[in-house]
């Protein structure tokens, strides 16, 4: 168990100064270097006279300088706001408007003109590192102080900045490094692929730094180039893979992504979107002895609140994989519309309470009041997810409440439709989306389909292909759930965080 993230990092800087903490395409940085660089930058930040505990925006990608900057800010008592350098300009501006940062540290080239906020660019940061200024940690982030603020991808209005405190982070980290479901290896060698602006990144950097391991970063330029991606992955000595299931699906396109090529890759941790039986089965075939962990949780509850190691029995018997056993320190309940707890087996909204729950959204009391509340004397959060609990304490996912529609009198879970579409022998991936009429009622269901390789060659027309898919699914899908229109694509759009962009497709359909 750790009690202070900075003290833990400092401990490893003293006891294993020459051990690698960060490796980005062979450029290696040690724990000793991380201490020297973050000390020097923390001293410089202190000299700027910023408002105490004010948030600082950090802009960039997967560079080592990002990690060193985060550590420096934590030492100097400031929360950091990670913003990915591939973000849309409107999003960056919206985050600036909401967050009102006291400083911008730009590891990538900052794309906006800013008059009223000082900026440190990467050349200045590098020069500060070279100064090697000693630093005594006296006012680091602690307790309920904000450790980081991550902005969600809000589809309407301004994005919301989720405030995660040092206590929140400790609740998550100590659970992950001690939980038998994860079984994190000693001194883990972890893949660092999800961008720092996505809280899934905390699932790789927090346990790695807490246990003195090494992060192996994958820059976006590599991730976006299939040839480079597969060549790079095959050379990385990572034990632990942390990503969305969608990114794993991308990796599975390479026949070399298997235990023979990557014998040291023994752990897969998934969060951020639903892990399907189909993806888990493919992974089990490629990595028969690997530990595949399905985790679940909203950003507002610090990365994840439940996790389970997927068994062969689950892969054989479950239509939908369980999302885990919940954290001991975080009471998790399923409630009805009146807020009453439901018995095991009954479906309702999942709520989480306890020390992992955020204090709310930065500078947004209205949205905070809508989502955060007190439940049985504890801070709690409405997840907006449907679920149920088994008698064995396993949490089952039932879909998003906002992805639940009413069509021809039937209540339909869009995720259920998508899950069934993905079971067709012809389908590689699929998503169901509703089209609304001018009265905002569902007019029909559409399916976006990516076909398996070679399938299109077997059919002259899309109509014949659609008939074949419907025939394939007739025994597992009710007629009222079957989409009336099938749209065939080479790929499905992803959000900047690597999830399938369902809401973007819904917007496209309903222009």
Curated annotation (Swiss-Prot):
Assigned protein family: Belongs to the ATP-dependent AMP-binding enzyme family. DltA subfamily.
Q: Where do the annotations place ATP binding? A: 152-153, 294-299, 385, 397-400, 499
EC nos: 6.2.1.54
Q: Which reaction does it catalyse?
A: holo-[D-alanyl-carrier protein] + D-alanine + ATP = D-alanyl-[D-alanyl-carrier protein] + AMP + diphosphate
Its protein name is D-alanine--D-alanyl carrier protein ligase
Q: In which pathway does it act?
A: Cell wall biogenesis; lipoteichoic acid biosynthesis
Localization of this protein: Cytoplasm
Enzyme's top EC category = ligase
Q: Which GO terms describe its cellular component?
A: cytoplasm
Species, as recorded: Streptococcus agalactiae serotype III (strain NEM316)
Q: What keywords would UniProt list here? A: ATP-binding, Cytoplasm, Ligase, Nucleotide-binding
């Amino acid at each position: 168990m750790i009690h202070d993230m900075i003290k833990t990092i400092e401990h490893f800087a003293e006891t294993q100064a020459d051990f690698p903490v960060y490796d980005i395409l062979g450029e290696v940085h040690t724990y000793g270097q991380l201490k020297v660089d973050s000390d020097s930058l923390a001293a410089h930040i202190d000299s700027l006279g910023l408002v105490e505990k004010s948030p600082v925006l950090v802009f960039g990608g997967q560079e080592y300088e990002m990690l060193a900057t985060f550590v420096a800010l934590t030492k100097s008592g400031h929360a950091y706001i990670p913003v990915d350098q591939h973000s849309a300009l409107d999003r960056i501006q919206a985050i600036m408007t909401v967050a009102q940062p006291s400083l911008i540290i730009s590891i990538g080239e900052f794309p906006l003109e800013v008059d009223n906020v000082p900026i440190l660019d990467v050349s200045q940061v590098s020069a500060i590192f070279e100064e090697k200024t000693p630093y005594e940690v006296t006012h680091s982030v602690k307790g309920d102080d904000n450790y980081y603020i991550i902005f969600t991808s809000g589809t309407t209005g301004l994005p919301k900045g989720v405030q995660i405190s040092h206590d929140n982070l400790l609740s998550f980290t100590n659970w992950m490094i001690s939980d038998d479901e994860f079984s994190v290896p000693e001194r883990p060698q972890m893949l660092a692929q999800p961008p720092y602006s996505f809280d899934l990144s905390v699932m790789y950097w927090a346990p790695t730094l807490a246990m003195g391991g090494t992060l192996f970063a994958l820059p976006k330029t590599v991730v976006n180039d299939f040839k480079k991606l597969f060549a790079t992955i095959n050379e990385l000595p990572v034990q632990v893979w942390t990503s969305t299931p969608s990114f794993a699906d991308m990796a599975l396109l390479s026949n070399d992504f298997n235990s023979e090529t990557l014998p040291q890759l023994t752990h897969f941790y998934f969060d951020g979107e639903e892990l399907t039986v189909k993806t888990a089965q493919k992974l089990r075939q490629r990595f028969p002895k690997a530990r595949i962990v399905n985790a679940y949780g909203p950003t507002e509850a610090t990365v994840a609140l439940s996790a389970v190691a997927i068994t062969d029995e689950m892969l054989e018997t479950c239509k939908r994989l369980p999302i885990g056993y919940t954290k001991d320190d975080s009471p998790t309940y399923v409630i009805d519309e009146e807020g009453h707890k439901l018995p095991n087996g009954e479906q309702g909204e999942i709520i989480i309470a306890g020390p992992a729950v955020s204090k709310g959204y930065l500078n947004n009391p209205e949205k905070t009041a809508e989502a955060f509340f007190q439940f049985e004397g504890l801070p709690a959060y409405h997840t907006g997810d449907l679920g149920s609990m088994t008698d064995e304490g396993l949490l089952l996912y039932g879909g998003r409440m906002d992805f639940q529609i009413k069509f021809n009198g039937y209540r339909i879970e869009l995720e259920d439709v998508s899950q069934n579409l993905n079971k067709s022998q012809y389908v590689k991936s699929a998503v169901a989306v509703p089209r609304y009429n001018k009265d905002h009622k569902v007019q029909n269901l559409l399916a976006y389909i990516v076909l398996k390789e070679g399938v299109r060659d077997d059919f002259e027309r899309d109509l014949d292909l659609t008939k074949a898919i419907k025939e394939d699914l007739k025994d597992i899908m009710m007629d009222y759930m079957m989409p009336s229109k099938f749209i065939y694509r080479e790929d499905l759009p992803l959000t900047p965080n690597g999830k399938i962009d369902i809401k973007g497709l819904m917007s496209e359909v309903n222009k």
